[in-house]
């Protein structure tokens, strides 16, 4: 049996998405910038995909910018707004537990002369609104916060954060990294006061290499890619029509039967947590209840290194992560785990399980059974 619990790293492409992508590659394969019929057909496909995405957020089609994925969306949001608004100020705010595509972009902006404030989080991974309010200044041009933490599943109070920002400085823009939240929460940028929102396709059963950035109409932002002026000059380069089409289909699917899907994920999560706790010597990081995201469980296993456990599980057909897949090729202790106060001896003993729509109860039970067999053996071996 196999059990794939690394859906926060990437997901399997749905059959309906695959069919739409193949059609866009092999039938409607024109360049969307071309003036002939094939080009017009491709352009129409992109427009339909934008509409599908915009409908899930209740925003305008023109506010959706297609990108190559979450990293580009985050880079565009941060660098683009920083450069466009630097006359108003050079101060930005984020948290100490962001994805590398935020953290490293902020580091780049610091090298460019911008000042960045990094807010701490509590033991559950949440920022303090009081800390945020104190950090906002007259020259603060952007606040960037992750909706759902990619390692422990902490959910930030996005609407309350927006209200805090706009009350203290109405001119400050609010960017949300929603890469782990899109498809798991009903996101309404207009209602929640979000100015920019990043999403990645391959987290929701779309192909890799495509994502989007929601940019509220009226936000001052500069492009970071230059060339032929595609997407109204905001993102030059030949449009990835198959990717955009696949993302549009996946976006629609992500919000079909929404309540039932999320209930299923929470039920699986609760079953997994209960099984892990019964194993003994296991600590759940972050919240165990439904204030946490429905798909992520971070667990620390006493006496076992995470990489050893990961490969032992892999040999049994259970696939998990020992950290953010976007940075797992660069060994190091997670800043998120440190930030929420995980004990030093458990920092290198932590595994992330991330559930998806295709998982079933039998897979959870199988994984727990495998862990029950492996842990005593691995602990004895590592204690020698």
Features from the language model and the residues they span:
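Pyridoxal 5′-phosphate
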Residues: 1-384
């Amino acid at each position: 049996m196999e059990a794939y619990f690394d859906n926060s790293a990437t997901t399997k492409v749905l059959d309906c998405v695959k069919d739409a992508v193949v059609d866009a590659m092999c039938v409607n394969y024109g360049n969307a910038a071309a003036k002939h019929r094939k080009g017009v057909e491709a352009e129409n496909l992109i427009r339909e995909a934008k509409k599908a995405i915009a409908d899930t957020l209740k925003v305008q089609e023109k506010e959706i910018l297609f990108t190559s994925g979450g990293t580009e969306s985050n880079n565009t949001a941060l660098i683009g707004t920083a450069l466009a608004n630097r006359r108003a100020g050079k101060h930005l705010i984020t948290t100490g537990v962001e994805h590398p595509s935020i953290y490293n972009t902020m580091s780049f902006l610091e090298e460019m002369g911008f000042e960045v404030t990094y807010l701490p989080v509590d033991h559950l991974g949440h920022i303090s609104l009081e800390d945020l309010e104190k950090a906002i200044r007259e020259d603060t041009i952007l606040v960037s916060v992750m909706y759902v933490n990619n390692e422990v599943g902490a959910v930030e109070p996005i609407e309350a954060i927006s209200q805090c920002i706009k009350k203290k400085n109405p001119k400050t823009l609010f960017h949300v990294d929603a890469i782990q939240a899109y498809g798991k929460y009903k996101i309404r940028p207009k209602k929640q006061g979000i100015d920019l929102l990043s999403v990645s396709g391959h987290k929701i059963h779309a192909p890799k290499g495509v994502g989007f950035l929601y940019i509220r109409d009226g936000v001052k932002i500069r492009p970071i890619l230059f060339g032929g002026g595609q997407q109204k000059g905001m993102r030059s380069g030949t449009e990835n029509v198959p990717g955009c089409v696949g993302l549009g289909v996946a976006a629609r699917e992500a919000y079909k039967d929404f309540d039932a899907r999320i209930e299923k994920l929470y039920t699986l999560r609760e079953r997994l947590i209960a099984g892990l706790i019964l194993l003994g010597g296991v600590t759940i990081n972050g919240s165990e209840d439904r204030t946490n995201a429905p798909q992520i469980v971070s667990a620390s296993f006493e006496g076992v290194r995470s990489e050893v456990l990961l490969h032992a599980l892999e040999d049994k057909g259970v696939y998990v992560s020992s950290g953010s897949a976007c940075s797992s090729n660069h060994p190091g202790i997670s800043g998120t785990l440190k930030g929420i106060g995980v004990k030093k001896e458990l920092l290198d003993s932590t595994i992330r399980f991330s559930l998806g729509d295709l998982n079933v109860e039998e897979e959870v039970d199988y994984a727990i059974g495998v862990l029950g067999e492996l842990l005593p053996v691995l602990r004895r071996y590592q204690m020698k």
